[in-house]
C-alpha cells in the first residue's frame, strides 16, 4: 500500500495555512466590491465566498514573493540573483531590484519632490536604462507602488509561478513515489529550461558588466557589433536588429530583452517577451525555454504534465481522471457546486466547470 510522504517542512506548511487564515476578509479585486472577503477553501485555490482565485485576492506579501522566487532560482545558474537568509538553514531570498525615481517639483519657495518607486526593475542595468525599459511597458502594467501595475505584477507572480509547482511541501497528500517524481521534475526544469531575461541595448546582450551595471557605450566610441545571425559585422555599417516575436526593428538606442537559453543573436522588444502559450508578459522576466520560445512557469509545467482542474496542482499520480483536455486527481473529481464525488456518476463539464446534473440544471435556471 502506498504511503503518504511525511511533511518535508512542517514549519513551512503551518506558516502557509496560517497565512491563509490571516488573509480572511481580504477583498477580491475581480468582484469589485461584491465579495464579502476572502474565505479559503479547504483544498481548492479559490475563495469560498466569491469562487474567484486566490490571485484575485492578492494574498501574498513582498517577503513571501521574494522567498518563493529565491527558492525557484536557488540551485540554478541564476542563484546569483538570490541571497542567503541569515539563520535560515540554507533558505535563499530573491534579491529583487527596486528602482526609486525622485523628481523635483517647482512649487514656490520650498522645493518638493515627486517620488516614484518601481516594485521591480530589471537587474544589472543603470537607472537610465532601467527607466527606458519601464517607459516601454504599458502604464497599467508598470509595477509602481500602490498602482494597478503593482497589483498586476503580484497576481502574475502567483499565476505564472505557483509555489506548488516548485515546493512539494505546498502540495497536498503527495505519495512517496509522487514526491520523488516532483523533486526530479523541479530539478530537471531548473537545469534545462529555467531562465531570467537580460535587459540591454541591442548588440550588448551577454557582455560583461561592471559591478552589476549594464555598460553604456561612450559617445563617439566604435565597437564591433554582432549581426542578428551572430557573426561579426563591419563597425562602420549600421546593424539592424529584429525582434524575435514581431519581427519589427529594434532601435539601437532602445533596450531589448535577451535570453541566454535562446542565444544572444536573438532579442525581443520588452512588450514582446511573453509566454508562447498565454501571450502574457513574463513576470520579472522569468521564463522557461521550450520549443524555441519562452514560456511562463505555469504553462511550461502543464505542457509536460497534467494539472488538476480541482486543486490546480501538477498531477504526478499514474491514475487520474481525464475529460477531453482537462484532468483531475481522482479524489478531486467532484462537483464544483455540491462537492459530491462524481467518479462513476453522471457529470457535465461546461466551460471547464465540473458539475453534477442537479447543480448544472440549477445553474442554468
Curated annotation (Swiss-Prot):
<feature type="region of interest" description="Disordered">
    <location>
        <begin position="200"/>
        <end position="235"/>
    </location>
</feature>
<feature type="modified residue" description="Phosphoserine">
    <location>
        <position position="16"/>
    </location>
</feature>
<feature type="compositionally biased region" description="Basic and acidic residues">
    <location>
        <begin position="208"/>
        <end position="220"/>
    </location>
</feature>
<keyword id="KW-0678">Repressor</keyword>
<dbReference type="InterPro" id="IPR001781">
    <property type="entry name" value="Znf_LIM"/>
</dbReference>
<dbReference type="GO" id="GO:0008270">
    <property type="term" value="F:zinc ion binding"/>
</dbReference>
<dbReference type="GO" id="GO:0010611">
    <property type="term" value="P:regulation of cardiac muscle hypertrophy"/>
</dbReference>
<keyword id="KW-0479">Metal-binding</keyword>
<keyword id="KW-0440">LIM domain</keyword>
<feature type="domain" description="LIM zinc-binding 1">
    <location>
        <begin position="241"/>
        <end position="306"/>
    </location>
</feature>
<keyword id="KW-0677">Repeat</keyword>
<dbReference type="Pfam" id="PF06297">
    <property type="entry name" value="PET"/>
</dbReference>
<keyword id="KW-0597">Phosphoprotein</keyword>
<comment type="subunit">
    <text>Interacts with GATA1 and GATA4. Interacts with beta-dystroglycan. Interacts with GATA6.</text>
</comment>
<keyword id="KW-0805">Transcription regulation</keyword>
<dbReference type="GO" id="GO:0005737">
    <property type="term" value="C:cytoplasm"/>
</dbReference>
<dbReference type="GO" id="GO:0005634">
    <property type="term" value="C:nucleus"/>
</dbReference>
<keyword id="KW-0539">Nucleus</keyword>
<dbReference type="GO" id="GO:0070886">
    <property type="term" value="P:positive regulation of calcineurin-NFAT signaling cascade"/>
</dbReference>
<keyword id="KW-0963">Cytoplasm</keyword>
<feature type="domain" description="PET">
    <location>
        <begin position="99"/>
        <end position="206"/>
    </location>
</feature>
<dbReference type="InterPro" id="IPR010442">
    <property type="entry name" value="PET_domain"/>
</dbReference>
<keyword id="KW-0804">Transcription</keyword>
<dbReference type="GO" id="GO:0003714">
    <property type="term" value="F:transcription corepressor activity"/>
</dbReference>
<comment type="function">
    <text>Transcriptional cofactor that restricts GATA6 function by inhibiting DNA-binding, resulting in repression of GATA6 transcriptional activation of downstream target genes. Represses GATA6-mediated trans activation of lung- and cardiac tissue-specific promoters. Inhibits DNA-binding by GATA4 and GATA1 to the cTNC promoter. Plays a critical role in the development of cardiac hypertrophy via activation of calcineurin/nuclear factor of activated T-cells signaling pathway.</text>
</comment>
<dbReference type="Pfam" id="PF00412">
    <property type="entry name" value="LIM"/>
</dbReference>
<dbReference type="InterPro" id="IPR047120">
    <property type="entry name" value="Pk/Esn/Tes"/>
</dbReference>
<feature type="domain" description="LIM zinc-binding 2">
    <location>
        <begin position="307"/>
        <end position="365"/>
    </location>
</feature>
<dbReference type="GO" id="GO:0005654">
    <property type="term" value="C:nucleoplasm"/>
</dbReference>
<dbReference type="InterPro" id="IPR033724">
    <property type="entry name" value="PET_testin"/>
</dbReference>
<protein>
    <recommendedName>
        <fullName>LIM and cysteine-rich domains protein 1</fullName>
    </recommendedName>
</protein>
<dbReference type="GO" id="GO:0000122">
    <property type="term" value="P:negative regulation of transcription by RNA polymerase II"/>
</dbReference>
<keyword id="KW-0862">Zinc</keyword>
Amino acid at each position: 500500500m502506498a504511503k503518504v510522504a511525511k511533511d518535508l517542512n512542517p514549519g513551512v506548511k503551518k506558516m502557509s495555512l496560517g497565512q491563509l487564515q490571516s488573509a480572511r476578509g481580504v477583498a477580491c479585486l475581480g468582484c469589485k466590491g461584491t465579495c464579502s472577503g476572502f474565505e479559503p477553501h479547504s483544498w481548492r485555490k479559490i475563495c469560498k465566498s466569491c469562487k474567484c482565485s486566490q490571485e484575485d485576492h492578492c494574498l501574498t506579501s513582498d517577503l513571501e514573493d521574494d522567498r518563493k522566487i529565491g527558492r525557484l532560482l536557488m540551485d540554478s545558474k541564476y542563484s546569483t540573483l538570490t541571497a542567503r537568509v541569515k539563520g535560515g538553514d540554507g533558505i535563499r531570498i530573491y534579491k529583487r531590484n527596486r528602482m526609486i525615481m525622485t523628481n523635483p517639483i517647482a512649487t514656490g519657495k520650498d522645493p518638493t519632490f515627486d517620488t516614484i518607486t518601481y516594485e521591480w526593475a530589471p537587474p544589472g542595468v543603470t537607472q537610465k536604462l532601467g527607466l527606458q525599459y519601464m517607459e516601454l511597458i504599458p502604464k497599467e502594467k508598470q509595477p509602481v507602488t500602490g498602482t494597478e501595475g503593482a497589483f498586476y505584477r503580484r497576481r502574475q507572480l502567483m499565476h505564472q509561478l505557483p509555489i506548488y509547482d516548485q515546493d512539494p511541501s505546498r502540495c497536498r497528500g503527495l505519495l512517496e513515489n509522487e514526491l520523488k517524481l516532483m523533486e526530479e521534475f523541479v530539478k530537471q526544469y531548473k537545469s534545462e529550461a529555467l531562465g531570467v531575461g537580460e535587459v540591454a541595448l541591442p548588440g550588448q546582450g551577454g557582455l560583461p558588466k561592471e559591478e552589476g551595471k549594464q555598460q553604456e557605450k561612450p559617445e563617439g566610441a566604435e565597437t564591433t557589433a554582432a549581426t542578428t545571425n551572430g557573426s561579426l559585422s563591419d563597425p562602420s555599417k549600421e546593424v539592424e536588429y529584429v525582434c524575435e516575436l514581431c519581427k519589427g526593428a529594434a532601435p539601437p538606442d532602445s533596450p531589448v530583452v535577451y535570453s541566454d537559453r535562446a542565444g544572444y543573436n536573438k532579442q525581443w522588444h520588452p512588450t514582446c517577451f511573453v509566454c508562447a502559450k498565454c501571450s502574457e508578459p513574463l513576470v520579472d522576466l522569468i521564463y522557461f525555454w521550450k520549443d524555441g520560445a519562452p514560456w511562463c512557469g505555469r504553462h511550461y509545467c502543464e505542457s509536460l504534465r497534467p494539472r488538476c482542474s480541482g486543486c490546480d496542482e501538477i498531477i504526478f499520480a499514474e491514475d487520474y481522471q481525464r475529460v477531453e483536455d482537462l484532468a483531475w486527481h481522482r479524489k478531486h473529481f467532484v462537483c464544483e457546486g455540491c462537492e459530491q464525488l462524481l467518479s462513476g456518476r453522471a457529470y457535465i463539464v461546461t466551460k471547464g466547470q465540473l458539475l453534477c446534473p442537479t447543480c448544472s440544471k440549477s445553474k442554468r435556471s
